[in-house]
């Protein structure tokens, strides 16, 4: 995963994240857009010290 730095694009802060209409988090969640290899606009959720792939249905159930 790309490392986050002060000069990275500012994240959009949202209070609640939804996955397929399901509420997944009550704490603030930060979403970052990255372009990695041939895959465009991968979205990661930065929560605490974890990176989670928002496209994964088990992302909010793991760890």
Curated annotation (Swiss-Prot):
Q: What does this protein do?
A: JH esterase plays a crucial role in the decrease of JH activity in lepidopteran insects, by hydrolyzing the methyl ester of JH. It is also involved in the transport of JH.
The protein here is known as Juvenile hormone esterase, isoform B
**Reactions it catalyzes:** juvenile hormone I + H2O = juvenile hormone I carboxylate + methanol + H(+); juvenile hormone III + H2O = juvenile hormone III carboxylate + methanol + H(+)
Q: Which GO terms describe its molecular function?
A: juvenile-hormone esterase activity
Give the family, as the similarity comment puts it: Belongs to the type-B carboxylesterase/lipase family.
Looking at the keywords, is Hydrolase present? Answer: yes
| Source organism of the structure | Trichoplusia ni
Entry keyword Calcium? no
- Highest rank taxon of the organism: Eukaryota
Keyword tags: Glycoprotein, Hydrolase, Serine esterase
Upper classification of the source organism reads: Eukaryota, Metazoa, Ecdysozoa, Arthropoda, Hexapoda
Q: Cite the EC number.
A: 3.1.1.59
